[in-house]
Amino acid sequence: MKKLTSIIAIAASIAAADGINAQSTEKHTQNPWTLVYDGAITKNEPGKVNIHPVTYKLNGIDIAANVYTPANYDASGKYPAIVVAHPNGGIKEQTAGLYAQRLAEAGYITMAADASYQGASGGEPRHTDNPAYRTEDIRGMADFITKYAGVDANRLGVLGICGGGGYTIKAVQTDKRFKAVATLSMFNTGEVRRNGFQNSQLSTIQERLKQATDARTQMVTTGKIVYAGVSSVKDEEIAKTSTDLYREGYLYY
């Protein structure tokens, strides 16, 4: 319980920090690891938190991730570790990386990975966000980080952000390697995709299921992939979006 409280307290302090939302998509060109959050590491220095890009296989897919090691990291030591699951539509260089870096500053070995089919990770069709895959991604991060030099596998935690929070809760229900869990702005993807935001689409559930079925049939029979409409949304459409959550999400992701 003490460790759980620690993760939550650290996450809350990060969220309250000034400038946490002052992230720009233009920053990726200015950082050697394409990190876009304020205060991101710009170079690895002795005695400080360092970042280590890594890749590994998960069910035949190449996964791209960043591991953050705490100041004065000693590979022969025993450190608690935390993996961070990014939001729906997010990548490891955004808010997941921010929290991973800040938690490393608190003494943890941390990890943020691009989900399968997303970011720099492999998998087709691109941008697939399947709850079963996302849950498996979290287990895959645990597979990797528990073998990382210096990690105490008996002190493993997980932080899930937004959509990653919902997938995190699902993962820890059955994966008992995780000894602590915390979420931030947790988003129930299944409920919202089914019912709409705040139950705004209850009347169209069957219609949308038919659209999903037709899209799958088309992919199987013709090879053509139907992507969700948000992939081509225009700035003027974003400005007209009445729900703050979606409007700000379009801009950020």
Question: Where are the model-predicted features located?
Answer:
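Short beta-strand element of the alpha/beta-hydrolase
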Residues: 76-87
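The serine-hydrolase catalytic nucleophile loop
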Residues: 89-101, 115
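Alpha/beta-hydrolase-fold enzymes
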Residues: 169-252
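Conserved alpha/beta-hydrolase
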Residues: 102-122
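Glycine-rich nucleophile elbow surrounding the catalytic serine of serine-hydrolase chemistry
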Residues: 160-170
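N-terminal cap/lid segment of alpha/beta-hydrolase-fold proteins
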Residues: 29-77
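Alpha/beta-hydrolase active-site loop
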Residues: 128-149
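Alpha/beta-hydrolase fold nucleophile elbow
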Residues: 149-162
